[in-house]
């Protein structure tokens, strides 16, 4: 849907969270490696909120504690330690991570803190074993340049990443601590973004700056974007966990649509003098003989069915607020998160789900539901139903006031769902186990004198110096292999840089699409490959098959791979001899077609010589030998 974003007063700010590719974690010497093999053990914890330095308890933390969940943490003996398990004090902050934070701050024109104080940010959703995340403020008041103008950067913080979620059960959540403690940059922009396209461009530009350092991790989950969105007649909404850059635009568009729709619903409810009745009624007896599978299942498990009356809400609960999501979905989200129920039913969508028209009529009569009213019912354990319906009552009342400020989760379709209330400042307090870090002018001067080349500068250089076309140069500049490309191109000047670039960017992707695990291919393998190519041990046509050979046999050397694949390079004399044999074997076609037999013969030559000789050599030799025969 097209909106006039200027008229609506759209304001968007970004929070970019980027993992750093450091040798060690932020507060211990463990590697920053994510694992998927079997863990060596587990521990269990229960977390509770504590007061901030000012004596307040954060409402988001309080909400999490009410879920009464236990947390299970998986660990590895050889790559995680007692620091991650919160059984040992944190070590000193990683100097490499601090230097990277200062480098990125400089590239974004920011003012550095003289002294960095480590803080604790309360987080009791289980994603941190300690119940808090360690974070430190590094710099502020910077800006980035985009095609839409400058966008202010509020702050840059260096913090530890959270645990990796493995499983979410009804009364427990399981995490792995391998990700906990990986250094993470949090970059927060000013709300200077005024359109969805500008939001995407700002995130792209920050990502470009981060990648220019060569010190950030790549791949899914290594960068996460949170988007803060508001319009003039709306509220600030924080959307968490946007992992795809292309999704940012749609997230902003859909949130604006949602806020406009919720405002329209509010106006309609006020016209109707709508009212939310606080009383929760037990309707278990009324629907005890229902054939609805959901309701029968709840009753079979000793659950209850309860309902609330929303006066003036008829037709409103089923109204769409985002593509495929309705006001009823907003109510359901609250019930699911705060009550732990599977969902709810409302009379805008009934009869349905096995609930008959007769049962709906009985329900409306029992609830004194008028023509313009609506009923919401929930079936589950008594305590869950009570919590869920109280949450729905609160959300229904908010729908008559406007748009509640809240944190929402990004969904893959560009929509969002309720996560928790917006957190406040009450969850921050100083870290007492780690000393502060002094940022000296000498340190900053050293950083300024060693800033990386920016991608736009590198692009121009790659086109000029390596003679790459612009599309391939753009791919290479943004590639994880950019440093390897430059190293190989300089070391093996006999090989065209275009071949090295296409191998790293196109060939590896094609091989991965075939189902082979390209993660098994190391830089040492690629180094050996291009060294062999420069020494004429193989032809360039053999490159894909040799790469596959390394993946299939990671411990083998190039000579062994060439032998396994039957691709050892031939001498010119051997190539000429084989081509002469092929011409003689097809002499009748040569006599009939003359030089017109070139295509047929080339195919047969390549079938026998591919990977063993350079394609150009095969072509020129065949042309020469064929001309000799024809003449």
UniProtKB/Swiss-Prot annotation:
Belongs to the GatB/GatE family. GatE subfamily. NCBIfam families: gatE_arch (TIGR00134), PRK04028.1 (NF003107). GO terms for biological process: glutaminyl-tRNAGln biosynthesis via transamidation; translation. Heterodimer of GatD and GatE. GO terms for molecular function: aminoacyl-tRNA ligase activity; ATP binding; glutaminyl-tRNA synthase (glutamine-hydrolyzing) activity. PROSITE patterns: GATB. GO terms for cellular component: cytoplasm. It is an enzyme of class 6 (ligase). It comes from the Archaea. This is Glutamyl-tRNA(Gln) amidotransferase subunit E. Keywords: ATP-binding, Ligase, Nucleotide-binding, Protein biosynthesis. It catalyses: L-glutamyl-tRNA(Gln) + L-glutamine + ATP + H2O = L-glutaminyl-tRNA(Gln) + L-glutamate + ADP + phosphate + H(+).
């Amino acid at each position: 849907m097209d909106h006039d974003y200027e008229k609506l007063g759209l304001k968007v700010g970004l929070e970019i969270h980027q993992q750093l590719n450091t040798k060690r974690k932020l507060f211990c010497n463990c590697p920053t490696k994510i694992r998927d093999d079997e863990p060596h053990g587990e521990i269990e914890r229960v977390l509770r909120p504590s007061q901030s330095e000012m004596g307040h308890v954060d409402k988001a933390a309080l909400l999490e504690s009410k879920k009464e969940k236990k947390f299970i943490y998986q660990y590895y003996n050889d790559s995680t330690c007692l620091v991650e398990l919160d059984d040992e004090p944190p070590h000193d902050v990683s100097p490499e991570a601090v230097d990277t934070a200062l480098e990125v701050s400089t590239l974004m024109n920011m003012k550095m803190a003289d002294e960095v104080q480590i803080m604790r940010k309360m987080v009791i959703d289980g994603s941190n074993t300690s119940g808090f995340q360690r974070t430190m403020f590094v710099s502020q008041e910077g800006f980035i340049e985009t095609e839409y103008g400058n966008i202010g950067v509020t702050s840059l913080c260096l913090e530890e990443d959270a645990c990796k979620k493995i499983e979410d059960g009804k009364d427990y959540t399981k995490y792995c601590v391998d990700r906990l403690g990986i250094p993470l940059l949090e970059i927060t922009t000013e709300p200077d973004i005024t359109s969805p396209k500008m939001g995407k461009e700002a995130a792209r530009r920050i990502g470009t700056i981060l990648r220019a350092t060569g010190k950030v991790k790549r791949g899914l989950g290594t960068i996460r974007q949170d988007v803060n969105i508001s319009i003039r007649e709306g509220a600030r909404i924080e959307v968490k966990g946007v992992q795809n850059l292309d999704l940012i635009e749609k997230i902003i568009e859909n949130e604006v649509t949602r806020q406009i729709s919720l405002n329209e619903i509010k106006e309609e409810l006020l016209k109707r003098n709508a009212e939310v009745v606080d009383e929760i009624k037990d309707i278990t007896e009324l629907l005890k003989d229902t054939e609805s599978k959901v309701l029968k299942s709840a009753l079979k498990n000793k659950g209850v069915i309860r309902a609330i009356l929303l006066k003036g809400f008829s037709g409103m609960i089923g109204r769409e607020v985002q593509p495929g999501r309705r006001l009823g979905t907003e109510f359901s989200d609250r019930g699911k998160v705060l009550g732990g129920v599977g969902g709810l039913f409302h009379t805008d969508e009934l009869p349905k789900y096995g609930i008959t028209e007769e049962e709906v009529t009985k329900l409306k009569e029992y609830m004194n539901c008028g023509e313009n009213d609506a009923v919401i019912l929930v079936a589950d354990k008594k305590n869950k139903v009570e919590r869920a319906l109280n949450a729905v009552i609160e959300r229904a009342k908010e729908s008559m006031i406007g748009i509640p400020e809240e944190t929402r989760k990004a969904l893959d379709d560009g929509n969002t769902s309720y996560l928790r209330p917006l957190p406040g400042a009450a969850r921050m307090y100083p870290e007492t186990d780690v000393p502060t870090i002094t940022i000296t002018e000498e340190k900053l001067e050293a950083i300024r004198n060693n800033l990386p080349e920016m991608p736009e500068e590198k692009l121009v250089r790659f086109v000029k110096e390596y003679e790459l076309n612009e599309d391939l140069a753009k791919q290479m500049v943004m590639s994880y292999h950019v440093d390897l490309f430059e190293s190989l191109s300089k070391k093996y000047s006999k090989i065209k840089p275009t071949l090295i670039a296409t191998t790293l960017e196109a060939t590896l992707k094609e091989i991965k699409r075939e189902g082979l695990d390209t993660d098994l291919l190391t830089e040492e393998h690629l180094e050996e490959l291009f060294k062999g190519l420069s020494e004429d041990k193989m032809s360039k046509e053999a490159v894909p098959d040799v790469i596959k050979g390394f993946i299939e046999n990671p411990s083998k050397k190039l000579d062994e791979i060439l032998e396994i694949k039957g691709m050892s390079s031939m001498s010119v004399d051997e190539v000429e001899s084989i081509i002469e044999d092929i011409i003689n074997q097809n002499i009748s076609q040569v006599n009939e077609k003359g030089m017109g037999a070139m295509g047929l013969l080339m195919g047969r030559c390549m079938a026998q010589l591919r990977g063993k000789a350079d394609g150009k050599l095969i072509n020129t030799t065949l042309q020469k030998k064929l001309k000799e025969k024809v003449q």
